[in-house]
């Protein structure tokens, strides 16, 4: 701690004449009272006669300001001592005393504020830490041994891998699902924001408008007569150059009416004409006139008969015409297929053949559309025949489509051999890619054979590995 020692100046004149200055010294002692002196560090000062005299200790009340001053002086002195590293130098009010003055420390009567130096951090290595350091390499060695054991192939892992290989389980990379609506974001007619919800709604209500098996309730009509009617309607549709939506809606109206009303044989064609008139008014901008339909039917029915049948059909269907036909799903599924025009023409060819055959009535419209896309890809060998994007948008997996696809693949060959060739001639034209002339798909049947062979191989491999395990043990 730094101290402030006040050295009294000795007046030589007073020392020479002590008697004369006695009264003055008494008054001087009162004035020179060391009220601010440090009682802890006193120094001896040589007098005039050369003898050392001790400076009397002075005490004063310790105030807060005085304590703060002492603490500041102590910190300043400690910093100066660290820098200069000088011994025996005493600073009094910032001024070094005379070299002739010898500094001597007197034991302090009171404890002054002491600034303790910051203790140095000492790291002690205990025997426990030494043991831990010795144990760490051992633990690392054990971990390395465990990892080596894990990497080493075991009998169980080998047999598991062989079983997966035998069962046909293959590790294949996850296919990326393509956003088929990305190109139509700026097309307002594509309604990209609502298209997914629309098709979810179509799939939820498609069974409500699907006709059931009605041939058992029609005494005068059979499946062949229905096929003849639809073949003729395809010709009328092509003659008037109507849209595909009109054809699919016409067939839907015919089946729904026949499922609800018993019809005699001579009125079957009239039902087809009335259904064509209703569908044309619903889908087309310019629908055919009634007299045009009379002419195309070779005047078999009059205008009044056609209008009466139109009203009768609408009453039986309760004017419910907004139904999801296979064409509604075909447009979406062809877009998800992302293929060329040949595949598109083949899809429509197979779908129309399916609509003409009564056997497809047991399948829902979305199933017929999805199976048509799958069969067309198989026919034109567009690998992969089915992918994640198609499965997402159709809602059907490849095995679910196999039964309907087999039925559709068999129709082209039958269409070429039968007399009902309206659809066959329509798609034999070069404008539609002449897809009707292509050979039917063999991929579907090959796929079924592969499934059968894989099942046989699984059984054989499981028996082989079971015997191998027993031989090892």
UniProtKB/Swiss-Prot annotation:
| Domain of life per record | Eukaryota
The GO terms this record gives for MF are:
cyclin-dependent protein serine/threonine kinase regulator activity
- Indicate the quaternary assembly: Interacts with the CDC2 and CDK2 protein kinases to form a serine/threonine kinase holoenzyme complex. The cyclin subunit imparts substrate specificity to the complex.
UniProt keyword annotations, A-Z: Cell cycle, Cell division, Cyclin, Mitosis
Write down what this protein is called: G2/mitotic-specific cyclin-1
* Biological process per Gene Ontology, one example term: mitotic cell cycle phase transition
The record's function comment reads: Essential for the control of the cell cycle at the G2/M (mitosis) transition. G2/M cyclins accumulate steadily during G2 and are abruptly destroyed at mitosis.
Q: Does the keyword Glycoprotein apply?
A: no
User: What organism is this sequence from?
Assistant: Antirrhinum majus
> Its family?
Belongs to the cyclin family. Cyclin AB subfamily.
Where do the segments described as Disordered lie?
1-23, 134-155
Gene3D superfamilies attached to this UniProt entry: Cyclin-like
Query: Per the record, where are the segments of Basic and acidic residues compositional bias?
Result: 134-147
Here the segments flagged for biased composition (Polar residues) are 1-12
Matching entries from Pfam families are given as: Cyclin_C, Cyclin_N
């Amino acid at each position: 701690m730094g101290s402030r020692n006040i050295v009294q100046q000795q007046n030589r004149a007073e020392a020479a004449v002590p008697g004369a200055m006695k009264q003055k010294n008494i008054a001087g002692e009162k004035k020179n009272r060391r009220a601010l002196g440090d009682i802890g560090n006193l120094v001896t000062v040589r007098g005039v006669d050369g003898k050392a005299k001790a400076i009397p200790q002075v005490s004063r009340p310790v105030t807060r300001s005085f304590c703060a001053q002492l603490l500041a002086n102590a910190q300043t002195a400690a910093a100066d001592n660290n820098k200069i590293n000088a011994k025996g130098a005493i600073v009094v009010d910032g001024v070094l005393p005379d070299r002739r003055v010898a500094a001597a420390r007197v034991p302090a009567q009171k404890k002054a504020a002491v600034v303790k130096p910051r203790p140095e951090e000492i790291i002690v290595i205990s025997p426990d830490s030494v043991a831990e350091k010795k144990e760490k390499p051992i633990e690392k060695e054990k971990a390395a041994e465990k990892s080596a054991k894990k990497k080493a192939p075991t009998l169980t892992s080998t047999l598991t891998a062989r079983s997966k290989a035998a069962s046909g389980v293959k590790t294949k990379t996850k296919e990326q699902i393509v956003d088929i609506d990305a190109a139509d974001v700026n097309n307002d007619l594509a309604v990209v924001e609502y298209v997914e919800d629309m098709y979810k709604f179509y799939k939820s209500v498609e069974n409500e408008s699907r006709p059931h098996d009605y041939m058992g309730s029609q005494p005068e009509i059979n499946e062949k007569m229905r096929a003849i009617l639809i073949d003729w309607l395809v010709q009328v549709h092509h003659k008037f150059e109507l849209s595909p939506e009109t054809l699919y809606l016409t067939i839907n109206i015919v089946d729904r009416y026949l499922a609800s009303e018993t019809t005699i044989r001579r009125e079957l064609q009239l039902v087809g004409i009335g259904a064509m008139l209703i569908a044309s008014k619903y889908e087309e901008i310019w629908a055919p006139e009634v007299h045009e339909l009379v002419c195309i039917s070779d005047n078999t029915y009059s205008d009044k008969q056609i209008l009466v049948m139109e009203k009768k059909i609408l009453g039986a269907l309760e004017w419910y015409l907004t139904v999801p036909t296979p064409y509604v799903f075909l447009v979406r599924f062809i877009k998800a297929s992302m293929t060329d025009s040949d595949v598109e023409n083949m899809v429509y060819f197979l779908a129309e053949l399916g609509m003409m055959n009564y056997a497809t009535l047991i399948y829902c419209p979305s199933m017929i559309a999805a199976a048509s896309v799958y069969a067309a890809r198989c026919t034109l060998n567009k690998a992969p025949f089915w992918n994640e994007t198609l499965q997402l948008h159709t809602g059907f997996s490849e095995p679910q489509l196999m039964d309907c696809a087999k039925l559709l693949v068999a129709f082209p060959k039958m269409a070429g051999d039968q007399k009902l060739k309206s659809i066959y001639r329509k798609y034999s034209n070069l404008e539609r890619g002449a897809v009707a002339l292509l050979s039917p798909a063999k991929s579907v049947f090959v796929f079924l054979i592969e499934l059968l062979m894989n099942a046989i191989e699984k059984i054989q491999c499981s028996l082989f590995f079971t015997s191998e395990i027993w031989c090892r043990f």
